[in-house]
């Protein structure tokens, strides 16, 4: 130990100190953001002299590394750290995350909420999913190519200041969707053994879901990919059982085809929900490919992710729409829906007068599928928090992951009892930012950078070299006005959205993206001209 005035330093032999797993020595010192210098002893041996703050932070990294948890945060992943060359890992990540009850329930909105028949619902599901998922696959390529997390990459794409705003929105979105997903699964678990007096309380259901999420997200990238590679299997099996029981019930009918302005409005509103779900992973995308080597074929990454996203989204949502059509044709199933939404329909299909005990077991498995959907939320929330503000990057990723899970648990329990409807409406509103983000990011890459060589990785945290974000922030604000005018929700219908059909139609995504695109491409050339970045 070395004392100098009121400062306390610890001296460590350079040759005896090895980098922490998932974090280089250089990055570890940079994160500490404290006084660090080298010293030379009388025998010419060099030492690193660090303040006690840096030493304490180093201890945290070493502790988490000893548990085999990923300690690397938002700093760029170097080429020698890129050891994940599995295309299957990239594809299965999103395959499992979407083979879940949340996407199944979303597909049911077509018939249940928007009054579309089965055929119309299927067409909307396919078209709007494709529109959304291609951006997730596209930005996943950036992770392997540049080694940057999505919110750090955003500093280049939307501007440094604007990226911080999107990071904040992303933190809210990660926790918010975790709350909504957890509440749905907790309600389904609560239905198991209904009437026996031995049911799973709502709070316990939330604790089970969050506990499972913590076990995986704590360890980081490698364990997440290992879990997601296989977690789709039991979920897929249960969905096959639902198909079998739905077919045996004979309650499914396709419904009549109806046209007109009101139907058009319903198509747009349902499509808006579908697009938001499929594109929802866009602001997470690069986080799950950063450890893939730069030499990995970009087309393989893109098309494998398109397939890994498309199949589970099409499959679960179409099945959800079919289940909803059946529920509309049966008063008992409809009563289950009115009481417990699509969780109630799942229970009605699998348990009473059906598979009984085995059906309840299937309900438990499907409720646990939410863990696979929550994992990306709780991993990315940590990286988004670190990207928000430099001092927050000092806090290890593992700590942020635990904090995100704790916040999700703390809010999901009262939300399930008292304001789950409010949470769903709130998250629907948050989702509109995706279209604005996509419009700005694609403009920057295709019009102004045009190739990966235009991204200087060394500038990832350099305020002097990164785009300021004047154009990006202006586009975000104007795009938000477009969203407000075009959205059609139960709590708000915009002046333009209300003009479509009897009940209005949601074109918030379309207006938000188009207005942001126009403003950004007017202001970005001026920003480059006067600021040079």
From Swiss-Prot:
Query: Cross-link Glycyl lysine isopeptide (Lys-Gly) (interchain with G-Cter in ubiquitin) - where?
Result: 16
Region annotation (Surface seeking) ranges: 165-184
* PTM entry text: Not N-glycosylated.
Q: What Pfam families does UniProt report for this protein, alphabetically?
A: Transp_cyt_pur
User: Topologically, how does it sit relative to the membrane?
Assistant: Multi-pass membrane protein
Q: Name one GO biological process term.
A: cytosine transport
**Any other comment in the entry?**
Present with 23600 molecules/cell in log phase SD medium.
Name of the protein: Purine-cytosine permease FCY2
Source species, please? Saccharomyces cerevisiae (strain ATCC 204508 / S288c) (Baker's yeast)
């Amino acid at each position: 130990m070395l004392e100098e005035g009121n400062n306390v330093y610890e001296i460590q032999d350079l040759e005896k100190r090895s980098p922490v797993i998932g974090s280089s020595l250089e990055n570890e010192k940079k994160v500490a953001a404290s006084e660090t210098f080298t010293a030379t002893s009388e025998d010419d041996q060099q030492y690193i002299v660090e303040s006690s703050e840096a030493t304490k932070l180093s201890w945290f990294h070493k502790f988490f590394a000893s548990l085999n948890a990923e300690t690397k945060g938002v700093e760029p992943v170097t080429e020698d750290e890129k050891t994940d060359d599995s295309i299957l890992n990239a594809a299965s990540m999103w395959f499992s995350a979407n083979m879940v009850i949340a996407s199944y329930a979303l597909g049911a909105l077509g018939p249940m909420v928007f009054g579309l028949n089965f055929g119309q619902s299927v067409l909307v599901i396919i078209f709007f999913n494709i529109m959304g998922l291609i951006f997730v696959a596209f930005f996943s390529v950036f992770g392997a190519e540049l080694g940057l997390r999505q919110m750090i990459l955003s500093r280049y794409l939307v501007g440094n200041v604007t990226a911080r705003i999107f990071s904040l929105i992303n933190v809210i979105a990660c926790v918010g969707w975790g709350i909504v997903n957890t509440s749905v699964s907790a309600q389904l678990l609560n239905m198991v053994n209904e009437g026996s007096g031995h049911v799973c309380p709502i709070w316990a259901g939330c604790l089970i879901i969050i506990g499972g999420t913590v076990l995986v997200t704590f360890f980081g990238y490698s364990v997440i990919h290992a879990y997601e590679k296989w977690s789709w299997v039991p979920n897929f099996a249960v969905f096959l059982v639902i198909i079998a029981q739905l077919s045996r019930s004979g309650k499914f009918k396709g419904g009549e085809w109806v046209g007109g302005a009101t139907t058009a409005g319903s198509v747009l509103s349902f499509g808006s929900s579908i697009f938001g779900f499929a594109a929802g992973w866009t602001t997470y995308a690069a986080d799950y490919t950063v450890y893939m080597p730069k030499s990995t074929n970009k087309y393989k990454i893109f098309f494998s992710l398109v397939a890994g996203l498309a199949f589970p989204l099409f499959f679960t949502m179409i099945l959800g729409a079919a289940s909803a059509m059946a529920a509309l044709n049966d008063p008992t199933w409809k009563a289950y829906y009115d009481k417990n939404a699509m969780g109630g329909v799942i229970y009605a299909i699998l348990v009473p007068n059906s598979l009984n005990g085995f059906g309840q077991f299937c309900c438990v498995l499907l409720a646990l599928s939410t863990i696979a959907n929550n994992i990306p939320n709780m991993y990315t929330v940590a990286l988004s928090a670190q990207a928000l503000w430099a001092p927050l990057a000092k806090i290890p990723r593992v700590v942020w992951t635990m904090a995100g899970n704790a916040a999700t648990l703390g809010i999901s329990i009262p939300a399930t009892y008292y304001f789950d409807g409010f949470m769903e409406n709130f998250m629907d509103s948050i989702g509109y930012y995706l279209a604005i983000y996509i419009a700005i990011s694609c403009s920057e890459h295709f019009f102004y950078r045009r190739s990966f060589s235009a991204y200087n990785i060394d500038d990832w945290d350099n305020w002097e070299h990164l785009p300021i974000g004047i154009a990006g922030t202006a586009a975000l604000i104007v795009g938000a006005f477009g969203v407000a005018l075009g959205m059609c929700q139960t709590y708000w219908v915009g002046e333009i959205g209300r003009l479509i059909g009897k009940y209005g139609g949601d074109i918030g995504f379309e207006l938000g993206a188009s207005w942001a695109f126009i403003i950004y491409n007017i202001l970005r050339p001026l920003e480059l001209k006067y600021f040079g970045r």
